[in-house]
Amino acid sequence: MNDSPTAPTASKVIAFAPGRCDIQQAQQAQQAQQAHQAHQAHRAHRACRDEALPIAENICTVRSNDWINPEYKHLVLSAPATALTAVAGQFFHIACPPGADEAAYLRRPMSIYRVEPDDERIEFLYKVQGVGTRGLARLAPRDTLDALGPLGQGFRLPAVAPSERAHVLLLARGVGLATMAPLAQEAIRSGARVTAILSARSASLVMSADYLRESGADVLVVTDDEQTSDVVQIERMIRRVHAAQAITFATTCGSNRLLSTLQRLTAEFGIPGEIALEQHMGCAIGACYACVRPFRKHSGSDELTYRRVCWDGPVFDLQETTSW
């Protein structure tokens, strides 16, 4: 019998509509704060959300909060039903508890690592590196945690012909590995083949490899220590994978250099791709415009537009994303 704390959980739903999704083209980056007046939809299949969006403030209960390597912890929560609707690529805005002698003023955005509705469970991987995450690291079983969400636009797996088996490539580094895990699970459930290339500074910092293998993914690990993680070798690896079975969809998270490499290769292969972006946020519900970034107006365009990572993303079209 599982003696882990189960949910004295609750949620409060707030109706929120941040306004029309029509962004006027900004002329310069410093004008981004004016983008709340209007902005254009960035992709045809991402519909404008004018209606009120129910946003849940979920009171979750900690089941475990364990170190998995010298830098990262694995947080497992019992969560109410409103939190269990999260999909791959979405995130929660977490109210971090105070640390030993400091407290985080703002919530912290955190990508979903795993959602298990049957067990009323959500999970996160996070790097302990600042005021907020040091507070999170102090959480113990049966503590409660306020998590606003699920928030943002998640990944969307493209349809493939009935005669074709989808082949999804996941390319991630560092904490970006956590974002890729639920997408791998979703793709495998849909019948797709999944190849995951996991990059880290050292083998001890590679996360999710065993979990992805157990889920059915082909996992390739590259590290700085072994001098296998440079973009030249990663590109060769992707080309070999594509030659063995054509990749039909590619995703990445966690590295600017991986973004540039994957943009070039997906354009060459003629396949779609998406990226999950990491960004500092204020409100995480589209109201404060603290997370606005420049994007290409469309694939191949030199014209820029500005979008809110929290509301229009954090998942975006790969070819429309600019380097940072």
Which residues does each PLM region occupy?
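N-terminal acidic, proline/glycine-rich, low-complexity intrinsically disordered segments
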Residues: 1-16, 21
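Local cysteine-cluster metal-coordination motifs and their immediate loop/turn environment
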Residues: 18-24, 279-314
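Long, intrinsically disordered low-complexity tandem-repeat segments
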Residues: 26-44
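Ferredoxin-reductase
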Residues: 48-143
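FNR/FR-type flavoprotein reductase catalytic core
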Residues: 131-282
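Short, surface-exposed amphipathic charged segments that create phosphate/polyanion-binding patches used
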Residues: 233-239, 287-292, 324
